[in-house]
Amino acid sequence: MFSNKPSVNILTSLLVAHGVKHAVVCPGSRNAPIVHNLNECPPITCYPITDERSAGFFALGIAQATDEPVVVCVTSGTALLNLAPAVAEAHYQHQSLIVVSADRPAEWIDQLDGQTLQQPGALAPWMKKTVTLPDLSPLTSHYSPLTSHLSPLPWHCNRLVNEALIEATDDTHPCVHINVPLNEPLFDFTVETLPEERVIRRYAPATDYSCLPQQLLDDLQSAKRPLIVFGQLSPRRFHYEGIDHLFSHIIVLHEALAPFTSVSPFEEVLTPHSSHLSSLTPDFILYVGDAIVSKRLKHFLREAEDAHTWRISLTGEVEDTFQNLRGLVVGDAEAILQALDSKFSPHIPHLSPHAVNYRRQWLQLLSDARQQLDNTPLTFSEEGAVRLLEQQLSSLISPHTSHLSPHSSHLIPLSVHYANSTAIRLANRYAKGHPVWCNRGTNGIEGSLSTAAGFAAAVLSPHPSHPSPLIFCVIGDLSFFYDQNALWNTILPRLNLRILLLNNGHGAIFDHLQGLGQSAAHPALVAGAHHTTAEGICQQCGVSRQVATDLEQLQKGILWLADAETRGPRLLEVML
């Protein structure tokens, strides 16, 4: 029988799953549920040591003898601090200790309660990873992995333990700290079996990307509904050459921030009331790149609870965006996909008919969505402005200049920076044929215009006779005025920076938040309503400016803005 504490059972299950075999345990009441569970697990041998200072070094000796990570479990308070000498020594010897400390509930820290101190980070200088598990006590009576989707807390707990144990079992043998806050009562041992928890594995094939994990290949080949998803990825670092088999047989969803020459209009496919959602739900997901803009796509993929999800990551960090991550392959995305393509191609004749039909269904729905967008009447609106700009840019782009050549270091002749919120979401509908840049790492309001200006400065031609590339920035009013000092510099007059300013007098993104419209604070206090224009800013900074107040002016203004025969900064302000 095991403890009734869900966090303790998740921890115990994952310790066993990650192959931990040795645990040094110290006496105490707060850590008793953890010690009890460790003792109940046949794969784990427990060694009782009373003095925590000695226990840490005892665990170090086991790690030296076995070359395996070793748990050392202590109660709350200064018991944790007594491990510092041993942990420091283990750190410099590259011996992995998994420090598991019980803790009091967060609300009782620094409240003069017994055996309480700030435990998270107490051993941070010698720890590769420190995590504090969430309080799962509200779920004590009914937790199981089958019901974990009802609350984000079990997923969070599972992910944190996986993160720590992935590091602890790494070839570099670091130390990690797992802090476990526990509420009373502590001594209820009535759970018959440990939960079968999701295990996340990390694979680092170093430079030999041909040695991909077999499980990844097996999951892909056996999938009936395989899906590849691309997030933000620099076009300078990915050219999708040598990946023809994968991309020709597996459906790929991507936004404007991915290094492709068009976008997938999946937002229009994944509408809440779509009758296709259940048949489109993938059973295999390969996630490449960084941030994804679409909330709808993220929600859709989080609903695929049983999907075998793999992530290609340059850093190796556990980024469980869809809450169903199983495997993490560390390295260069293009090289890994090329290796996967090579291993996948012999199995194409044996691809499941379900997988073939799944791709065909997606392609048809995406084609219908694109046709619907293209047939929508053009209006004087934010959407109309972006649509007209992208149409005009298409006429400026040749097949030879639409993306970076992987075999040269030439600067691209045209790039478009989209600010966050409404602007980048419109790019996901209409951008095509050119790289799209956006500060999506943190998704902040600040810096979009400054980033575009810096980009324009970096690609400025050193020869007056050679025209510099056109660099566009599509930006909303709040983001523009917030970052207006991007235009306050001496190099600006030389930049071919072209700004499409969508000025609707407030943050339009707030209009789409359900329920916010009922608040009296919405227009002025939340959405930042204003009556400001860019006229004065353009005058003082030497930026040519035109204004569009109707569709005809907008059409003429876009032609003026995208005129490649002229030089210098220009701004088209669309007054909506």
Model-derived features: where do they sit?
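Active-site diphosphate/adenylate-binding microenvironment
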Residues: 8-16, 29-30, 34-35, 39, ...
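Phosphate/pyrophosphate-binding active-site segments
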Residues: 1-2, 137, 301-397, 412-422, ...
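Conformationally flexible catalytic loops at phosphate/diphosphate-handling active centers
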Residues: 158-163, 167-222
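Thiamine diphosphate
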Residues: 100, 107-120, 429-461, 467-576
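A short, small-residue-rich loop immediately preceding and capping a beta-strand
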Residues: 21-24, 45-47, 65-104, 282-289, ...
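N-terminal cofactor/phosphate-binding cores enriched in small/glycine residues
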Residues: 2-88
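Glycine-rich, acidic loop regions that bind phosphate or pyrophosphate groups
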Residues: 101-139, 152-164, 253-366, 513-514, ...
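Glycine-rich, anion-gripping cofactor-binding loops and their flanking helix/strand elements
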Residues: 230-310, 318, 433-460, 482-485, ...
